[in-house]
């Protein structure tokens, strides 16, 4: 938080302040726990001044950049700014002359600004005389005191600023405003407080609304950032002002974060090239899916010995492979990593400590960043229900067993996903003697003594294996497909079920299912029943389905899209250019950064060629800066 400042203190001023001490009050740090008010002191203020032209500003010290959360009427009257124009902004805008200026005025004393910053960093009181500017550009001197406000835990939670205003005799000349922004503001305010555009405002906002009285910052941070990407794309065609505002990349990042969640945007930022990619372009391509295409890649290294039925997942931009079924059904326990950020990606065997027992038919999931979690599968001694964690970025990567209490029964070919970067969710699978399961368990691996918790539900989907679990909309889970029990039979399924774990009593809901009594099928052509397919969670909640085992086919290549957040979910088919893989299985495909799916290998008989990859990319290759400047939103 920075305030306009101009330090011109002198001995005469000190004498004047001493004379005022006898009849004034001082607002200062009142010791532990908050603000105190005392009589006298070096910053004495006349009682008449307190009751008169006193500006009061409160800023939130716990938020980045100390945003203003309150201003009083005295501040509004003295500065010409209305509360809605300044809330959410940093106080440094008072250093700029006029509402559209972007830089501190050269007459502002930077040494005083530095002193203010020092006081804020140290949590001490600041007192001084500052040069500020009204909304109309006229200067005034303000006697200012900034006082920290403490919470119950001795943490500074807010800063209170008290200002007393005096006109300044500085001759600054007329206020210059850029032509574009002058036209934006060239409106006449009618008696009923609405806006009537003037003739020179032709082509700009002509709505009779107080909305356009708001500053650009308030419009972006409080209104536009809360819209969906599609809504922002529509808003930018309303007028030139909104068009220019919606070309701001910082606004697009806020829009994406609000629409997709902070976790999704953080994952996107870890992907190579995303930081140099315009968020507006990213929002468009992940919303319209116009850039989806297949690419075939060849990488170096090798995964030896050869195997199948392994499990793979992505940690950032790295693909991690663990275990699998070797020759003669030999369970394997080695770990391989493929770094897609490398100039020449190649498979690399990782020497890890305390490797888990070998297995196949297990699940490997990424919790967050570089931490992986492994569960279940079939080992040398039979089915497993153990949990192991691995931190890829540790100096010496080590598989660490998580001894969870009350674990689910051992299983393989189950499905799992992670929540909040801390919790593992496990559902279904195959138990001893080929019994199919329908239970759902949750484990918080960050607890000192983790305890498995079965999700209670009055009704559960039919028992199944080879299905998929996808997280969307925060803490909601979507289950699709699998080999499900139907009476005495086991049939491939294309059922869709959802579970909201944020509810007090979570319950499964059937969205669609050909085998469910009374279940309604959504509009559009749905995917054929399948198991061991690929499910890709897209930012915004949509789910992409392809591949797997389909009756009469080895692996279906069509892509199906479903948005479970819609009032009436509708299946859509995506026509994707490029050459798709011949095979795509859920256990050997992983989603990297929310922008691409990597399908590992081709298959000839029982041999896997893991140096051949197929990438389903959701974005166009990165454009140069000139192309980015020309890139525009039109949905």
UniProtKB/Swiss-Prot annotation:
The modification S-4a-FMN cysteine is found at residue 91. One of its GO terms (molecular function) is photoreceptor activity. FMN binds covalently to cysteine after exposure to blue light and is reversed in the dark. One of its GO terms (cellular component) is nucleus. Residues 209-255 form the F-box domain. It is found in: Nucleus. Residues 44-123 form the PAS domain. Residues 1-32 are annotated as: Disordered. GO terms for biological process: circadian rhythm; protein ubiquitination; response to blue light. Keywords: Biological rhythms, Chromophore, Flavoprotein, FMN, Kelch repeat, Nucleus, Photoreceptor protein, Receptor, Repeat, Sensory transduction, Ubl conjugation pathway. Transmembrane segments: none annotated. Pathway: Protein modification; protein ubiquitination. Kelch repeats lie at residues 371-421, 423-474, 476-530, 542-594. It holds the Pfam family F-box-like. Gene3D superfamilies: 1.20.1280.50, Kelch-type beta propeller, PAS domain. Residues 1-25 have a biased composition (Acidic residues). Component of an E3 ubiquitin ligase complex that plays a central role in blue light-dependent circadian cycles. Acts as a blue light photoreceptor, due to the presence of FMN, that mediates light-regulated protein degradation of critical clock components by targeting them to the proteasome complex. NCBIfam families: sensory_box. Belongs to the ADAGIO family. This is Putative adagio-like protein 2. It comes from Oryza sativa subsp. japonica (Rice).
């Amino acid at each position: 938080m920075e305030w306009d400042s101009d330090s011109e203190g002198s001995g005469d001023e000190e004498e004047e302040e001493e004379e005022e001490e006898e009849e004034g009050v001082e607002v200062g740090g009142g010791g532990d726990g908050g603000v105190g008010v005392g009589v006298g002191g070096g910053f004495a203020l006349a009682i008449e001044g307190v009751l008169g032209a006193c500006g009061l500003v409160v800023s939130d010290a716990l938020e980045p950049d100390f945003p203003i959360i309150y201003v009083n009427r005295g501040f509004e009257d003295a500065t010409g700014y209305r509360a809605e124009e300044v809330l959410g902004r940093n106080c440094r805008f008072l250093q700029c002359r006029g509402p559209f200026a972007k830089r501190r005025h050269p007459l502002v004393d930077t040494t005083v600004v530095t002193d203010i910053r020092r006081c804020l960093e140290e949590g001490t009181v600041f007192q001084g005389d500052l040069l500020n500017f009204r909304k109309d550009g006229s200067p005034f001197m303000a006697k200012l005191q900034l006082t920290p406000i403490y919470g119950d835990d001795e943490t500074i939670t807010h800063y209170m600023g008290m200002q007393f205003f005096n006109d300044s005799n500085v001759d600054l000349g007329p206020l210059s405003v850029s032509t574009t922004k002058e036209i934006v503001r060239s409106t006449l305010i009618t008696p009923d407080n609405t806006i009537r555009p003037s003739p020179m405002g032709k082509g700009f906002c002509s709505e009779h609304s107080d909305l356009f009285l708001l500053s650009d910052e308030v419009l972006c941070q409080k209104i536009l950032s809360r819209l969906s990407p599609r809504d922002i794309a529509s808003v930018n065609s309303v007028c030139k002002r909104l068009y220019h505002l919606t070309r701001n990349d910082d606004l697009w990042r806020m829009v994406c974060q609000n629409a997709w969640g902070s976790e999704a945007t953080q994952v996107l930022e870890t992907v190579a090239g995303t930081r140099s990619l315009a968020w507006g372009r990213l929002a468009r391509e992940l919303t319209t899916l116009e850039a989806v295409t297949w690419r075939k890649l060849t990488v170096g290294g090798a995964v030896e010995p050869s195997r199948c039925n392994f499990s793979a997942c992505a940690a950032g931009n790295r693909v991690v492979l663990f275990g699998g079924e070797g020759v003669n059904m030999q369970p394997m326990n080695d770990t391989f990593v493929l770094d897609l950020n490398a100039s020449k990606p190649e498979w690399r065997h990782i020497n890890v400590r305390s490797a888990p027992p070998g297995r196949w038919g297990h699940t490997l999931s990424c919790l967050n960043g570089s931490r992986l979690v492994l569960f279940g599968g079939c080992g040398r001694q039979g089915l497993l229900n153990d949990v192991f964690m691995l931190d890829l970025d540790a100096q010496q990567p080590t598989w660490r067993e998580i001894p969870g209490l009350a674990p689910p029964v051992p299983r393989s070919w189950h499905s799992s996903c992670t929540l909040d970067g801390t919790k593992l969710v496990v559902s279904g699978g195959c138990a001893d003697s080929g019994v199919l399961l329908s239970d759902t368990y949750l484990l918080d691996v960050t607890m000192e003594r983790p305890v498995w918790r079965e999700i209670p539900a009055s009704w559960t989907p039919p028992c199944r294996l080879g299905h998929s679990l996808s997280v969307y909309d925060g803490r909601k889970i979507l289950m699709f497909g699998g080999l499900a029990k139907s009476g005495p039979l086991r049939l491939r399924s294309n059922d869709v079920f959802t579970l909201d774990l944020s509810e007090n009593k979570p319950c499964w809901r059937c969205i669609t299912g050909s085998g469910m009594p009374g279940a309604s099928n959504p509009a559009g052509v749905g995917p054929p029943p399948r198991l061991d397919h690929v499910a890709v969670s897209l930012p915004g909640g949509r789910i992409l389905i392809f591949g797997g085992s389909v009756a009469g086919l080895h692996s279906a290549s069509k892509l199906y899209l479903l948005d479970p957040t819609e009032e009436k979910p509708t299946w859509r088919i995506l026509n994707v250019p490029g050459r798709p893989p011949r095979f795509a299985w859920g256990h050997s495909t992983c989603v990297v950064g929310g922008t691409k799916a990597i399908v590992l290998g081709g298959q000839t008989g029982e041999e896997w060629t893991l140096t051949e990859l197929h990438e389903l990319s959701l974005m166009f290759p990165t454009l140069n800066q000139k192309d980015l400047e020309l890139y525009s939103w039109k949905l």
